[in-house]
Amino acid sequence: VAYGDQQVVDNISFALGRGESLALIGESGSGKTTIARTVLRLLPKGATILGGEVSFDGKNIARISDREFRELRGTQMGFVPQDPGNALNPVRRIGVQAHETARVLKLRSRAEERQRILETFEEVGLSDPARIYRSYPYELSGGMLQRVLIGLAVMPRPSLIVADEPTSGLDVTIQKVVLDLFEELKRSLGLSLLFITHDLAIAAERADHLAVLKDGVVQEQGSSRTVFAAPTSDYTRELQADVPAINPDRYRSIHLARNTAERNALGNQIDVQSVSKTFGDVVAVADVSFAVQRGKTHALVGESGSGKTTTVRLLLGLEHADSGKIVVGDAAVNGHSRSQWRSVRRHLQLVYQNPFTSLDPTWRVGKIVREPLDRFGVGDKDERRDRVAEAIRSVGLPEEMIARKPAKLSGGQRQRVAIARALVMRPDVLVLDEPTSALDVTVQAEIIDLLFRLQSELGLTYLFVSHDLSLVRQIADTVTVLQDGRVVEQGPVEKIFASPADPYTQALLKAIPAVSRVRENGRVLEPATV
């Protein structure tokens, strides 16, 4: 397949049997999404199939008419897209959108369609299907929306489901629920599943077969057991080495070495004391307390709605606590005038989750990084220029990047720019809000290594907000587990992960993909079998 003059998929072949699952694994640009679009005949204008064929139940998809394919696509092939927030129309009720899918069933009445929709919602584990039917997408959680999309995909009882990164934005426990749902539907309905992911841990645990792609070429493929236990390509081994769930000591050895170095006992850099916050009748944070030592990394973990985001907003002064106290350095965050707070805020900077949305696409990198200096009135023009160049160099980017716009940068380069923007103020604390969740695994490794280096060189304190517990275990010194706005457990990360006391923490840890269990012939192999 080529887009214009650029070939993006080269001589890729694989077979997927009835009732089996195959994971296409690769980073951005590997060609995995193009393959999915080819199977579904969703290639954009300008794309050309240079050779080969896609055969589905003996039919060459490229050669059948549009009418034949629409019928095939509506009844025999289902698609679960990556982002349910973008896949569903936000201004139309779920039920209205579900009826568009139900029409392919050619039932006798709208009432019958509604009944089938409600039955399908119940089948995919949505409690109170009637409420879901009446709801708008913004009224449902990410996990609920993903279940809706899965329900719409399986409603016509297709023989193939193509799932494009269906769990990439979900909390670890919701991720497990969604993957378990796929397993159950595959088993009960005899579905074949083409699973597209960059997460080798999920693929190894959940798929019967794996195909590893890079730059549009298959690096290797085979059963999950074979590819995972004895990879033959250097690229697959590199992917394995960079996945925290597969290689538990990928970052931990660096982290422990850093912590054994001599360090002055400087006390706490962040001290959160009995903080509470409500929005109307909703208790967002209730009596939350934790402390972070200078130069250390503290993780906040929990599912959506646990209070992580509200806690961060309180720390940054974007919300005011109803009660309690927050101290950063030697200054209290709450109770200050605006001018006093600006002085505190200079030493407390945020790195956002998604570098594809957190950078203004119309600005050049130099302006993006300089913006905090302009906002706080730091230095003259020459000093600001020098500090921007210093920040760019510190994150490992060449200075010529200053003249580029975000569209000309890769995901990893964009996140480095976001980190440079935070560093330009020379802060004491960085709040890292899921800083690697939108990145491929090898790019994630580069960013984590960069953060370790900066912390060691600059003595930074990190507050790391994440739902990736396998990563938290490796990079954090201490951790606070939040549920429904309350602290359920906290302490040294090794202690919490080794012997969690609270059932909620135990459930979170249990939901981490267990890569020691890989699949062969549809059954899960325990560690002793591999």
Task: Place the predicted regions along the sequence by residue.
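Conserved ABC transporter NBD signature motif
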Residues: T48-N60, G324-A332, V344
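ABC ATPase "signature
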Residues: V218-G222, A230, Q490-G491
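Conserved ABC ATPase signature
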Residues: S135-L140, M144, K405-L409, Q413
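ABC ATPase NBD coupling module
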Residues: I61-G78, V96, V104, R225-P231, ...
